[in-house]
Amino acid sequence: MADQLTEEQIAEFKEAFSLFDKDGDGTITTKELGTVMRSLGQNPTEAELQDMINEVDADGDGTIDFPEFLTMMARKMKDTDSEEEIREAFRVFDKDGDGFISAAELRHVMTNLGEKLTDEEVDEMIREADIDGDGQVNYEEFVKMMTSK
C-alpha cells in the first residue's frame, strides 16, 4: 500500500513522523501520539491511543516505526478525507471561528505541533492556499488545498 506514495509524499510523511517522534528514537509511542493529538485540540483516552497504534503496529512492539507510519498514512489517504474530517481540521486552525485561517492562527497551530516556522514560511503557506488573495484562507480554499494533494 505504501508503495503507491510519491517521493514527495514520503518526504512530507517523514517530516510529519519526526513531529510525532519527540525523542527522535525512530518510533512513536502512545505518549508521543497523545501529545500531538492534544496539541491539535483532540482529547484521546489512553485506550484510544493504544487502539490507534495497534491498528498499524505490524511487529507488535507497541509503537509505530516509520514503515508502519507510512502504511497508516497511505491507508488514510485511500479513504480520502470525509467532508466532516476536513471541516474538523479547518476548525482546529480557525481559532477565533471567523471562517478564515489567518497567518497568526496558522503559526499558532504549527508552533503547538513543535514546528517553528519563520514569518516568511507562514506567509508562503498562506499564499499557496489563498486563491482570492485576501491574505487568509477561507473554508473553500482550505478544502481545495486538502483535496489537491
From Swiss-Prot:
The modified positions for N6,N6,N6-trimethyllysine read: K116
Pfam families registered for this protein in UniProt: EF-hand_7
Alphabetized Gene3D superfamilies for the sequence: EF-hand (1.10.238.10)
The protein's superkingdom reads Eukaryota
Q: What are its GO cellular component terms?
A: myosin II complex
Q: Which UniProt keywords apply?
A: Acetylation, Calcium, Metal-binding, Methylation, Repeat
Binding site residues for Ca(2+) 3: D94, D96, D98, E105
Q: Is Magnesium there in the keyword field?
A: no
CDD domains linked to this entry: EFh
Q: Which SUPFAM superfamilies match?
A: EF-hand
Q: Which InterPro entries match?
A: CALM/Myosin/TropC-like, EF-hand-dom_pair, EF_Hand_1_Ca_BS, EF_hand_dom
What positions does the entry give for Ca(2+) 2 binding? D57, D59, D61, T63, E68
Which residue intervals define the domain EF-hand in the entry?
Answer: 8-43, 44-79, 81-116, 117-149
Additional facts recorded: This protein has four functional calcium-binding sites.
Q: Which family does it belong to?
A: Belongs to the calmodulin family.
Q: What job does this protein perform?
A: Calmodulin mediates the control of a large number of enzymes, ion channels and other proteins by Ca(2+). Among the enzymes to be stimulated by the calmodulin-Ca(2+) complex are a number of protein kinases and phosphatases.
The protein's name is: Calmodulin
Name the source organism: Renilla reniformis (Sea pansy)
